[in-house]
Amino acid sequence: MAEIKNYTLNFGPQHPAAHGVLRLVLELDGEVIQRADPHIGLLHRATEKLAEQKTYLQSVPYMDRLDYVSMMCNEHAYVMSIEKMLNLEVPLRAQYIRVMFDEITRILNHLMWLGAHALDVGAMGVFLYAFREREDLMDCYEAVSGARMHAAYYRPGGVYRDLPDAMPQHKASIIRNAKAINKLNENRQGSLLDFIEDFTNRFPTYVDEYETLLTDNRIWKQRLVGVGVVSPERAMAMGFTGPMLRGSGIEWDLRKKQPYEVYDLLDFDIPVGTNGDCYDRYLVRVEEMRQSNRIIKQCVEWLRNNPGSVMTDNHKVAPPSRVDMKSNMEDLIHHFKLFTEGFHVPVGEAYAAVEHPKGEFGVYLISDGANKPYRMKIRAPGFPHLQGLDEMAKGHMIADAVTIIGTQDIVFGEIDR
């Protein structure tokens, strides 16, 4: 009798559900996955090596391009690592701005994840809803930095500039009449803080809409419940962090366990799952959006009542103001020196980690006293998650592999680096 062999199938890297350039080699017994072998490196851009040839400040934009849907959180870990080595005091207002934008970034990431995950599983509508809200948050990025994605807004010692007093207005065009423009500009009459506050008031209703579409949806539950189950012990052993770890029932969040910036002054809860399956991870992330909204509300209130500096007063790191630079020769020389040679960091090493939307994102820097890092190592949260794909997918059908890749929230920019 003929021997029945397992079938090998290439999944990706052009597959629409592959989340970028994921290539999986699947070993199948019929339609059941026996082994899932992820092949990485198709988006490798040598970020860690490039940082060794750039000044500390010039590497900030590289951080945006690691996990390119959670831009400012990547920058945050990097600048915190530099600040540790320089013993820099960051003004309180800058810390609140950073935390507010970290949480805006978390919502941006989770909206992208929710829309893409639902689309992979077959729910088209949620994708369109999620992108409606992302527009407003992208406008916040644009208001502070001029860019809708790669902001490069954080700086060692603070942030690039204070929050603007006015929001840009939409103008009438061929594709939009005056009535539509007035509707778009309704909540743009005040400052950026007014715009963000208006968003935080509307957002809980939007999250309820997503839950109405998905949470009790029979097909959604059939596709997610009991799929990709990871026990708490295995989640810890495999190095899972973020929603992947909390979905398995372990309450570990750097914002609570190792508070950085002003998280210890804010009131929020950490959602935790019970079953460790795709459905629990979905519920954890949806609740995280609500908690992020709470944090943003508190930051807006504090920032409104406490004006102040947003950059350290250590001028070995902080450039002079534009006004001084254009009226004073010494300040111009100072500015030129900071942006050509850059500041020198004392010999030493530092690791700083943030609670990134995907897990623990860490940057380990080693300095030899020069104006460039001797070595930079990035701890990408998605890397251990992708490593666990083989264990999570074993025994499931091919269709479930798509669900499991979706629940891991994989972005290859940070995995391949």
UniProtKB/Swiss-Prot annotation:
Keyword Protein biosynthesis: no
Group of enzyme by EC: translocase
Membrane topology of this protein: Peripheral membrane protein
Keyword check for Translocase: yes
Keyword terms, alphabetized: Cell inner membrane, Cell membrane, Membrane, NAD, Quinone, Translocase, Transport, Ubiquinone
GO molecular-function term, one example from the UniProt record: quinone binding
Top-level taxon of the source organism: Bacteria
Subcellular compartments: Cell inner membrane
GO CC annotations, alphabetized: plasma membrane
E.C. number(s) listed in UniProt: 7.1.1.-
Pfam families named in the record: Complex1_49kDa
Oligomeric form and interacting partners: NDH-1 is composed of 14 different subunits. Subunits NuoB, C, D, E, F, and G constitute the peripheral sector of the complex.
Family from the record: Belongs to the complex I 49 kDa subunit family.
Function field: NDH-1 shuttles electrons from NADH, via FMN and iron-sulfur (Fe-S) centers, to quinones in the respiratory chain. The immediate electron acceptor for the enzyme in this species is believed to be ubiquinone. Couples the redox reaction to proton translocation (for every two electrons transferred, four hydrogen ions are translocated across the cytoplasmic membrane), and thus conserves the redox energy in a proton gradient.
Protein's recorded name: NADH-quinone oxidoreductase subunit D
Organism: Herminiimonas arsenicoxydans
